[in-house]
Structure formats: structure tokens, C-alpha cells
Amino acid sequence: MDFWLYKQAQQNGHHIAITDGQESYTYQNLYCEASLLAKRLKAYQQSRVGLYIDNSIQSIILIHACWLANIEIAMINTRLTPNEMKNQMRSIDVQLIFCTLPLELRGFQIVSLDDIEFAGTDITMNGLLDNTMDIQYDTSNETVVPKESPSNILNTSFNLDDIASIMFTSGTTGPQKAVPQTFRNHYASAIGCKESLGFDRDTNWLSVLPIYHISGLSVLLRAVIEGFTVRIVDKFNAEQILTIIKNERITHISLVPQTLNWLMQQGLHEPYNLQKILLGGAKLSATLIETALQYNLPIYNSFGMTETCSQFLTATPEMLHARPDTVGMPSANVDVKIKNPNKEGHGELMIKGANVMNGYLYPTDLTGTFENGYFNTGDIAEIDHEGYVMIYDRRKDLIISGGENIYPYQIETVAKQFPGISDAVCVGHPDDTWGQVPKLYFVSESDISKAQLIAYLSQHLAKYKVPKHFEKVDTLPYTSTGKLQRNKLYRG
């Protein structure tokens, strides 16, 4: 199959691919810049690299350049601690990291995009698009000179089953999982999203979710597959986002529930040109749904995972009006079912489809991931008689705070290393701003202050993973067989 960017440059070349409000690149511009950079990246002779990047045009050029150079990209969450980053990259044998942000990480070759000279001036697209020319630099006048050189021609096609990206589902002190996402996975996800949500070449999608998350990267894949425009924003600011929505004819936007709430507080009381507001990353409250629908905002609730290359369940405004607790129905190209439902119809959600990963890169010895071709999500769900899916527990122990997945095991492991703590458990605590925040229960015979615990945990965990609430207890609730009863700790 032809690279999607190559195809768009040929067929949709003058359409705006990406803009940050100051600078815009057509699909031809984007392909040209990515091709130039790809040739530079080939010199590093790496088949897999880490990316430490922001939401910027340069980061998007870098992503496409890696793919044109047949390099797999491992996305690094920029909020992680250095040790967390090291452990993730080492687990998948990454030695080199390209970055668009300052980074110091011992034991790795760090290459800033600013240090790679690749930007051209006035280069014709003809040679690139018919794949007959190489690009070389004439250092005497700092211009780019097309030159026939078949030995260094970039591939314009790719294998759908090659790995495109790698993302991690959790931190690294606890059980981490490296998810390989193939081009086929991304393509199937994009097609499913198009059918269940809807977009076309006239779409103008505002993307503010981090590119290192599947929710951010998936927007870029949908764009290059379909040929629409992405308005990239690096940081969320409600006033700025609302201004962009009003003034730049934004048709689509991806948000987590709290950011939608902030936008409504800022004055998003009508849809303007918005056709679709795609929500995910945390449960929607009934109040948020009611308020948004009163403003006639086109909200679409969704559910997806890193392992499924973003959403595979989508709820339309009509569905949310009928059942506010639903995450909707599955995309047409996936199949879902409930494993071992109880008398209430609740059981583990299983999914099968081309959007689902083939298996984890790390650890390699996991069992029970798939059953008869269905991926075991670990989420407790129900499918009602109309086909609506309700998610009751997102992997039960998982804490979802502001769209970030936090695994209690990682926090507990670090906490138990604190002098004087004999046992600890972390659960999600309700929070008006973030949905949930971590709360740590610990057993100790010593007097340990909250400040001491925060200082210690902050040395080992990313800031958003550090518990916001602490409670000292005499014992933790275990069953007679030694199983921790976390449900007894879920209280306000």
C-alpha cells in the first residue's frame, strides 16, 4: 500500500494538512519536509527509536519522516520521570531518542530535531512524487538540489502489518505493557471512527490531546488517511481553545470530560461550527451530559484503549439522551461480547477486530490476553437488549485521572519501600476536577506525615501519579485466601 502521506501529496496536495495558527503546511509541503528529514534519519541506521515530542508541526513532520524511513516510533509520555522513561525504552531495546523538547537521559543517544539540518527552500515536488529523485544539500548556497540517485530512494509503499508505533499502557515500576500498533491497526481504527463518528476532507479537527497518547496520535492518522486538516495546539487553555473554535471554523475536537467542562465554563454555550465533540479518557457525569446537551453541543462519548488504537465504542448525542451511562455501540468493523456474564449481564468485555494489537512486545510471556481471537479488555461491562454498551469498571483497579491511566500497583510498590510502611494500597478517590485522583492507604507503626510521603513518592513517580490523599489504617482488608478487597476501600 502507498504511504498515506505520499498518496495525499499526489491527490490532495494543495489541501492544508496541518496548521498551528501561525504556520500551515499543505499535504505536498508536509510530504516534502518529511521526505527530506527521512533521508537524514536513515543515516542513524535505527529500526526503532523513541520520540520525546510536543504537539507541534515539527513533531508531526518527524513522525511521518520516521515512517517514510521505515523506523518504528516508541512514544514517550513527557510527564514521566527519567527512570520511568529509561525502563520503558530499555524494555523494547530503544537506544536512540529523537526529541522536539529538551531532554537529558543517561544511557541513550539523544538527538534534537533542531540539530538535524533538513529544511528545504524552493524544491519542486515532481521528483519526490514520481519517486525518481534524491534530495541532496548544496552547502555552497544552502539550497536543496534534486538529483537522480536510485540508490537512496525512499520507499513510497509499506506493509500494513509492519509496526508503526509503540505505546505503553502503564508506568514502569509496576507491570508495564508495551503495545505494538501496526499500520493495519491504525487504518482499521480510522475506518471504524469514520463510520461511527463521521469525518471527511472538509473536516477541520482541533487536536490538543498529547500526540504521545493514542487519542492524540489517532487524529493524525485519521487526517492523513482521509485528507483533512488538523489544527494542532500544544497546551490546553480554555480561553484560547474557545477563541479558536469561534474564529477558525473548527468542525471536530477531541477532549476529556474535564476540558469540556472548562470550555463550557469559559462560554462554550453553542456549537458554532462544531459538528463532533469526541469525548474519552474518563467517565462522563450525568450533569456534564445534561449541560452539554442543553447547549446543543454535539457530544460523542467513546471508549477505547491503547491496545485497540483508540475508540471502538461510540455514543451519539441521541444515545446519550436515551442512556447517559452508555459508551455507545461498537464500530461496524469490530465485534464485542461479554465473557461469563452474571445474572445482571455484567461480565468482562471482549473485542475482536483489525484495530486490535496482535500481542504485547513486553512482557512477552503474558497469558490470557486473547481467547478465541477476542482480546480480553479486563473491563467489566454490559450490553443491553438494544446493543448499548455500559462500562462499569475500567479494569477495576485502574485509576483514570484527567485522561491519564494510573496503575495502583506502581504506587503501592514504591510506597512499601518507604521506611516504616509495612503494607499499602492505592485506590481512586473521587475528584471534581480530574474525575479521580490516587488515594493511598498505608499500615505503619510510625508517625509518618503527608509531606514526608509526598516528598518520597515524588522522587520515584510522575507528578500526576503521586497520591493526593493519604490515610493511615491498622490493617487492610484481605479475604481468607489473602486477596485484597479493594472494593472496601472505595469510599469518599
UniProtKB/Swiss-Prot annotation:
Q: What is its EC number?
A: 6.2.1.26
Question: Record's SUPFAM superfamilies?
Answer: Acetyl-CoA synthetase-like
| The keyword ATP-binding is assigned to this record | yes
Tree of life domain: Bacteria
User: Signal peptide span per the entry?
Assistant: none
MF GO annotations: ATP binding; o-succinylbenzoate-CoA ligase activity
- Pathway annotation: Quinol/quinone metabolism; 1,4-dihydroxy-2-naphthoate biosynthesis; 1,4-dihydroxy-2-naphthoate from chorismate: step 5/7; Quinol/quinone metabolism; menaquinone biosynthesis
Q: Which reaction does it catalyse?
A: 2-succinylbenzoate + ATP + CoA = 2-succinylbenzoyl-CoA + AMP + diphosphate
Question: What GO biological process term is on the record, naming one?
Answer: menaquinone biosynthetic process
Does Repressor show up as a keyword for this record? no
Q: Which UniProt keywords apply?
A: ATP-binding, Ligase, Menaquinone biosynthesis, Nucleotide-binding
Query: Which family would the database say this protein is a member of?
Result: Belongs to the ATP-dependent AMP-binding enzyme family. MenE subfamily.
What does the function comment of this entry state? Converts 2-succinylbenzoate (OSB) to 2-succinylbenzoyl-CoA (OSB-CoA).
Could you identify this protein by its name? Answer: 2-succinylbenzoate--CoA ligase
Species: Staphylococcus aureus (strain MSSA476)
